[in-house]
Amino acid sequence: LYVIMFLFLLVLGLNSYAILRRALLKNAKQLGTSLARSYAAEERSNLTVYETLLSFGTLNLDRLAEEEAWEDERKELWILQYFKRVQAVVGDGRVDPYAVMNGKIIAANPWEGDNSYDYAQTNWYRMAEEAEGEVIFTDVYTDVIYDRPVITVAQKCVTDDIVIAFDIFLENFQFEAGGFYLPQNASFYLCDKNGRMIWYDTTLTGYPQEEIQAYIDGLLERVENGELEDYDAYVRSPDNDRRAVYYYEMSNGWQVILTVPYNTLLGGLGQFTTVFFIVMMLSLIH
């Protein structure tokens, strides 16, 4: 009878563990997805600031062209003053604003060789031309002037041959993402629509960025293949930590990824299991 009771309690305990584990992981899936969505919404609201500033510039230039018929020289002075206001709003050095007006580059921070810069062949300029007055965001690329990874936000005037653009260096996204609250030992990754990291806050300290990028590439491939949709799906990070993955795609194609260690998700359950087996072992001794 004693053995039967022991086996009954053991089976009951194992079954309870499985039920609790399933419930915890399912709840974590819902919460993690909601967190990823909220982080995406927060980042979207920050990007709206750049969109609003660009639209302010292009709308005013369109108005000046239609109502007041300003000459190019006067427009150029207005654009330079507008750039100063933009930098005052977002913070000095956070964006590098410039414009192309009738084939001429107007820059808040002029660079050497700007007269020979083939802007018409750049991705940001072609995207702005094709967007018919909508704001565009490029993917991450290496800027030929500064030789640094950058994202360009640009918009073309509707009634005038002017394109305004802001270069945003990736380190300047830290301010926006830095306000996010992350679960214990969680990692956050913001990527462009091609999966290249824009900004990240990770526990993988000491790992080179190239290795982290390769890890994200593999993770996104598994997301695309539907391999991480189950509530108990996980990945192994470069430090061999088992992690749940929560993902959300923003309206502009950027991707938000949140990874949380299983130890964080199931920490309390592990303690329960340890206590249960200690009690069971003690019952065997007595």
Regions found by a protein language model. Give the residues of each.
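Extracytoplasmic/periplasmic sensor domains and loops in membrane signaling proteins
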Residues: 72-84, 109-142, 173, 203-235
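Extracytoplasmic/periplasmic ligand-binding sensor regions of membrane-associated signaling proteins
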Residues: 93, 102-179
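Extreme N-terminal signal-anchor transmembrane helix of membrane signaling/transducer proteins, especially
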Residues: 1-22, 26, 30, 277-285
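Extracytoplasmic/periplasmic sensory segments of membrane signal-transduction proteins
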Residues: 30-134
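Solvent-exposed, extracytoplasmic
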Residues: 79-90, 163-207
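Extracellular/periplasmic juxtamembrane segments that couple receptor/chemosensory ectodomains to their
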Residues: 162, 193-194, 205-275
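Short loop/turn microsegments at loop-to-beta-strand junctions
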Residues: 94-96, 153, 185-187
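Sensory-module boundary signal marking interfaces of small helical input modules
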Residues: 20, 173-176, 265
